[in-house]
Structure formats: C-alpha cells, structure tokens
C-alpha cells in the first residue's frame, strides 16, 4: 500500500536524521519537522479519508506506530544530549575550589558602642531597660520637674504629635530624652534602684557636625539611702576610664538641668588637642558627653519616694559623641550616612 510505504520512508529518514543530530537546537527543529502539527507524518495521512475502510485502518495503525517510535526516539535522544551537555560543562568545573562567600554585614558602630556602654554599666551593678519612643507630656516633662514655661517645651525643640487630648492640648510627643523611663520605673519599683536606659531620642535641632534631630542616648539612675555626689563622680569616672582609657582627661563643671540639683556637665578631652579648626570641639579641647546631677527631691516625691530618706543621681549621655572622641570622627552625620566606606572601619 502506497500510504504505508510513505510512512515507513518518513520514519526511516527521521530516525537517520535524529541519529546525526548533536545540538539541542537542531533537536527541537527535528521535533517540529516530524512530530509537530504540520509535520511530514501528518501530511502523509491527509488522503486517508479517500481510502477503503480496511486500507484506512492499516494506514492509521502504521502511522500511530511510527509516531510512537519517533516520540520514543526523540525523548531518548533529548536525554542523552542533555547529559552530554552537562558532562561537557562539568569538565571545566573544579569542585575542589572554594565557593564565593556571601558578603557578611557588620554591626553598626552605634550598636557596638551601645552594647559596650551597657556592658560596662552592667558590671557596675546596673540593670538595662528600654522604654517607649512615643511619650506623653507628663512623663517627658512634668514628672521630671520641667514646668510648662520651660524652653524645652517649645516646638523648636520638641516633635509634638498632632493628636490633641480632651482639653485640646498637644500631649503626645517623640521623647526628647530617655529620662521618662526613670519615672516609669520608679512608679512601679521602690529603692534601691540602679538602671540604665539606652534608646533613640528626638529633638528639633539644626543639623551640624555635632547635632542631629535623632540620636542615641543612655540614661542612668541610682536611688538609695546615702547616695551622694561622690557616688556620681566615682561611677562616671570609672565609666570614662573603662571606655576611653586611663590617660584621657575628664572634666566636671557645674550646669543646670531641671530634674537634678546640683547639676554637672561632664566633658572629655578632644583628640585634636585643642586645634582651632576642629569641627568637633571648636578649639576648646573638650567635648561634652553627658549631663548629670543629684535627682531633684520633687522628682522623687512625684513618684512616691521619700526624699528625706532616699537620694539618688542621674545622668544622660549622647552615644554618638563617644566614638567621635575615641576614633577622632569629625562629623556626627557620618553615622547615619549609610556610607559603607565609613562603616567598614568598625
């Protein structure tokens, strides 16, 4: 029968071509030519409808057998070609070579300093706490003996949240210091107290080499019987010795803070040696790192602690200034610049 003969010839030709193929792209072209919708095999079957029934059945069976044989041969050839291609690629791969390492991040210098500072105070008997960054007026100001007419309440220094209370007053803000956590802790705990509170604080200040609107602060509080300025000075001197080294100069001088009385400012000698062109100390040779003092009796009384029986001291330091002094960094904004050339140095 002529149709069966054509099918046999197409099959033999297809298998011969398949045997000679060496590239996967040629294999796909072969599939389209012999197994596609418009393949040679399909074309050979177009005249089957005009044949007698018996011949039509025989030709159809031959076509199905041919198609099955070609499909099986195609799949086998495809698998062998892929394995050969993979083997040729593997020959150029030295599996004994070490892989390319993934880039590993580093702990941010401010996080490193925060961990170091809290570790130092932990060895001095302090507990480490955290507090909310969104505060209310009472804990951020009133409870810390900051009256309503104090300049710190002005919008120029405080980020108020536009959510008035029942009286129409703005009562919610981004904390300007970590001191509110002192009040919250004393409201629920009685002396003896010895805590430090690290965290972000926010002040509406002009940005320059030593000031930014968001920075990191660590607040400390000690309340117990018989606490004096000697305890305050001894604690802070020991901290400076451990952090900066024994040869660094530390200066205490009087200052005013509403929630302590008396108050002191603590400064550390600048690495520039007092050069006039220094953008950090502006030629003074000193950089203030913290404010401190004896806790004001009114602050203790507000939280129900007897100020006649207990005394205490508090301090708050800007953490960005510590690595600036240690490493001679001349601009506080570098810590928040996301410049990997700077961050990789720590």
From Swiss-Prot:
Top-rank EC class of the record's enzyme: ligase
Gene: pheS
Oligomer and partners: Tetramer of two alpha and two beta subunits.
Regions crossing the membrane: none
Enzyme Commission (EC) number: 6.1.1.20
Organism: Dehalococcoides mccartyi (strain ATCC BAA-2266 / KCTC 15142 / 195)
MF terms (GO), sorted A to Z: ATP binding; magnesium ion binding; phenylalanine-tRNA ligase activity; tRNA binding
A single GO cellular-component term on record: cytoplasm
InterPro entries: aa-tRNA-synth_II, aa-tRNA-synth_II/BPL/LPL, Phe-tRNA-synth_IIc_asu, Phe-tRNA_ligase_II_N, Phe_tRNA_ligase_alpha1_bac, Phenylalanyl-tRNA_Synthase, tRNA-bd_arm
Main localization, broad class: cytoplasm
Gene Ontology annotations of biological process type: phenylalanyl-tRNA aminoacylation
Entry's localization field: Cytoplasm
Cofactor(s) the record lists: Mg(2+)
CDD domains: PheRS_alpha_core (cd00496)
Name of the protein in question: Phenylalanine--tRNA ligase alpha subunit
Pfam families: Phe_tRNA-synt_N, tRNA-synt_2d
Reactions it catalyzes: tRNA(Phe) + L-phenylalanine + ATP = L-phenylalanyl-tRNA(Phe) + AMP + diphosphate + H(+)
Details of cofactor binding: Binds 2 magnesium ions per tetramer.
């Amino acid at each position: 029968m002529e149709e069966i003969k054509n099918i046999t010839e197409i099959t033999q030709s297809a298998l011969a071509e398949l045997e000679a193929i060496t590239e996967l792209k040629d294999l796909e072209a072969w599939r389209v030519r012999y197994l596609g919708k418009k393949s040679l095999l399909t074309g050979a079957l177009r005249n089957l409808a005009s044949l007698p029934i018996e011949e039509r059945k025989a030709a159809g069976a031959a076509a199905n057998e041919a198609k099955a044989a070609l499909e099986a041969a195609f799949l086998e050839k495809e698998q062998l070609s892929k394995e050969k291609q993979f083997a040729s690629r593997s020959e150029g791969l030295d599996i004994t070579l070490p892989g390319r390492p993934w880039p590993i991040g580093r702990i941010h210098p401010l996080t490193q300093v925060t961990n170091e500072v809290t570790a130092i105070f932990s060895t001095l008997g302090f507990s480490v706490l955290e507090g909310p960054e969104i505060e209310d007026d009472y804990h951020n100001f009133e409870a810390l003996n900051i009256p309503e007419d104090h300049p710190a309440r002005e919008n120029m220094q405080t980020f108020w949240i536009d959510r008035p209370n029942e009286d129409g007053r703005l009562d919610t803000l981004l904390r300007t210091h970590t001191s509110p956590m002192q009040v919250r802790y004393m409201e629920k705990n009685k002396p003896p107290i010895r805590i430090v509170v690290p965290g972000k604080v926010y002040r509406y200040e002009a940005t320059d080499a030593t000031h930014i609107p968001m920075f990191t602060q660590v607040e400390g509080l000690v309340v117990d019987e018989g606490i004096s300025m000697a305890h305050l000075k001894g604690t802070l001197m020991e901290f400076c010795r451990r952090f900066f080294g024994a040869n660094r100069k530390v200066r205490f001088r009087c200052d005013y803070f509403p929630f302590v009385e008396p108050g002191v400012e603590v400064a550390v000698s600048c690495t520039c040696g007092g050069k006039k062109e220094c953008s950090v100390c502006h030629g003074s040779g000193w950089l203030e790192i913290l404010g401190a003092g004896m806790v004001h009796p009114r602050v203790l009384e507000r939280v129900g602690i007897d100020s006649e029986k207990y005394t205490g001291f508090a301090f708050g330091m800007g953490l960005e200034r510590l690595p600036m002094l240690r490493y001679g960094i001349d601009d506080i904004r570098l810590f928040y610049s996301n410049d990997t050339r700077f961050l990789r140095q720590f």
